[in-house]
Structures are given as C-alpha cells and as structure tokens.
Amino acid sequence: AYEEIMNFNNQISHEKFLRSYSQINPNQEYFNEIISLNKSLMQMRAGRPLPIVMLENNVGQIMTSNKAFMGQKTVLYFWSQTQMNHFKRNEERAKVYKEKFPNYRFVGISIQPYNQLVRNYQEIMNIEIKDQLALVNYQTTTSDWVINLLNKGIILDKNCLILEGFGNFGYEKSFESLLRKHKKIN
C-alpha cells in the first residue's frame, strides 16, 4: 500500500485506492499509517504552504522552517551525516545549480542533528554554513515533508509555498527543468 500511495500522481486515484484498500485491509493501525502518509502527500502538493517544522543551524540555534526560508525562492536538498560522499556530491550539484539559477537560495538539510564532526568537515570544505541546517525531529519532519529518499529536492517560492514538493535533486536534467519551470514565479 505504501508504494502504491507514493507512486500515484493524482488525488482521484489515491482516494479510489484507499477505498479499496480499506475494505481488504484487516490491520487498522497500518491503514492509519497509510491515511497519514496520504495526508502528508497532499500537504506537499504545489501551491500548499510548506508544513512548518523545527530546524537547527550550525551553532545550535533552533528556528521554524518558515522563518528560515521566508523571503527568497529556496531549494531544499537533504543529506545524511552517515553518507558524507552523498553530501559532497549534493554540495557540488548545489554549486552548479547556484551558478545557473542565482535567484534561488540552495539550503542543505542534514537529516540528523548537528555534531562537531560535521561542523569541522563543513569548515574544512569551505561550505557556506548559513545555507546548512539540520532536522530537530527526524520522525516528524520526514513524515510531514515526505522525505523518503535523500535525493529529494523541494522548491519553494519566497512565501514558503511549495512550487515542487517531490523533485529529484540528484537527477540533474530533471531537476534543472523544474528550476527553469519555476524560475519566473516569485
């Protein structure tokens, strides 16, 4: 059921699937998880406000996501402290995207809270720390923002409205076309 919900592209199909699934599924707890996922997917659709979560900056200050991203078109991409090669590749991608799309702010988000090792690594690699944040609550944020892959990319307008909630930051051609598509929007 999880994969079906994640792969459907329109609400009518979701609702039809959920009605059928509710009739054959004997496990109410699992059904509730699927309903919750569907709700999160609907919240991440284009035109909706980005669900507000708590984030942490490099020095441990906690802030809300809307405060962190308000005022400029923003691209969110994700990384894990356990996969530093992935982080390095994403930083290289972000640098290329920044050159092509300077009207966007590119923000890397660690799915784990910051630690000193990451701070040191970012300093050695000359990474702009003002554009690096970390999740405060992994469980809540990955559920609210439907972060099921580290290559996920989210594009926001300057008012934290979602322009693209399910981009693939790691697939350059596809993601560049999304950035181009939303280039003229606030």
Which sequence ranges carry the predicted segments?
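Oxidative protein folding and maturation machinery
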Residues: 1-62
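A structural signal for short secondary-structure junctions
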Residues: 47, 69-70, 100-102, 145-149, ...
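Short active-site neighborhood of thiol/selenol oxidoreductases, capturing the structured segment around
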Residues: 63-94
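Loop/turn elements at helix/coil->beta-strand transitions in domains of secreted/extracellular proteins
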Residues: 70-73, 102-105, 129, 158
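Structural microenvironment flanking redox-active thiols in thiol-disulfide oxidoreductases
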Residues: 85-125, 137-143
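Short, internal strand/loop/helix patches
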Residues: 122-158
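Thiol-/selenol-based redox modules, centered on thioredoxin-like
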Residues: 155-186
